[in-house]
């Protein structure tokens, strides 16, 4: 699994593009596109591959959501952690978070080190009715959420096959060999 290391583009809620980067000593730094620093804060561990922008408080002020270890963090653009974060989940995070927006809210998907994709609500609680997605081969990325009519499906591509799941995580299709949509 390739873990992106950034810098991570930050665009929502401001006129000028910025990047959040993790420095060699694990500090987090927000910079302008020309490299000028805005701030830097201490951090103790590597990020797990993505920084997503969310409007957690529904006030049109976006925060940066990211993961490390078994925790999710929410950082505002002034470099302050915002409550009620950090939030712990039950197992180590290999890759994430990946945010899926819907109906003015969002869900958070994480790939855990036990090769399971799990969906969480905005408060980092497992989504009720969700069935973890797991495969025999290593999951290397997040599924695509596809809407067909009124239904939504997760399309997960692995090196060997294409798997289709209901929005709840229930597996309904397995395309392998020459039928795989890789």
Where are these regions (language model features)?
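Short loop/turn segments that connect beta-strands within beta-propeller blades
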Residues: 32-34, 76-80, 121-125, 166-170
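Aromatic (tryptophan-biased) beta-strands that constitute blades/sheets of beta-rich domains
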Residues: 1-3, 36-43, 82-91, 126-135, ...
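Repeated scaffold domains used in trafficking and secretory/extracellular systems
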Residues: 2-9, 45-55, 90-100, 136-147, ...
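Trp/Gly-enriched beta-strand/coil motifs that build multi-repeat beta-propeller-like domains
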Residues: 60, 84-85, 105, 112-114, ...
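Acidic, glycine-anchored loop motifs typical of Ca2+
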Residues: 10-17, 56-63, 100-107, 146-153
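Loop/turn residues immediately N-terminal
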Residues: 24-29, 69-73, 113-118, 159-163
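Conserved beta-strand element within WD40/beta-propeller blades
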Residues: 19-22, 64-67, 108-111, 154-157
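Beta-strand-rich domains and repeat architectures in extracellular enzymes and scaffolds
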Residues: 2-26
